[in-house]
Amino acid sequence: MEIKFTIKQVVAVGIGAALFVVIGMINIPTPVPNTSIQLQYAVQALLSIIFGPIIGLLVGVIGHAIKDSLAGYGLWWTWIIASGLFGLVVGLFRKYVRVINGVFDWKDILIFNLIQLLANALVWGVLAPLGDVVIYQEAAEKVFAQGIVAGIANGVSVAIAGTLLLLAYAGTQTRAGSLKKD
């Protein structure tokens, strides 16, 4: 099976990964060590809805890997993969959010936020900490505390910033049936 990307998709991955890195450098600390409020997941969610699950996955994996490399504390693959999986899961449900058609009303906002909250709970509350325990032999209590705080913080930041980004994007799209002949 050969996967081909359009120029638009390649550019979306590049810009998305770059934004992931730059926005990810803004760290708002939490009381849990090595855990901060991250704002880049709103952009990743936007790109996942617009371009789909593979682009969302690549933005998360590439962006998080570069961010970790630049931060100087090494690559933490369980969390890098979790970032990619967040984009993948959100992108898998893109057909239920009508933003590409210029529609992002209360129903779409609700669906988007249910999807992203479940994705955040899954990847940060379960998969990333479980990976840390299995692969890195980290203390379960510590990494699950980090994961739960990260999941809540990311869920709230995507609910606010991601919703605003999708509202703005939907406003740039032409709604079906909105053009009338004079």
From Swiss-Prot:
Main localization category = membrane
One GO cellular component term, please give it: plasma membrane
One Pfam entry for this protein is: ECF-ribofla_trS
Question: What superkingdom heads the lineage?
Answer: Bacteria
Tell me what topology the record assigns in the membrane.
Multi-pass membrane protein
Cell membrane listed as a keyword: yes
According to its UniProt record, where is this protein located? Answer: Cell membrane
Assigned keywords, A-Z = Cell membrane, Membrane, Transmembrane, Transmembrane helix
Keyword Zinc assigned to the entry: answer is no
Query: Could you list the residue ranges that cross the membrane?
Result: 10-30, 46-66, 73-93, 109-129, 148-168
Similarity section:
Belongs to the UPF0397 family.
Q: What NCBIfam families does this protein map onto? A: PRK13661.1
Q: What is this protein called?
A: UPF0397 protein SPH_0594
Organism of this sequence: Streptococcus pneumoniae (strain Hungary19A-6)
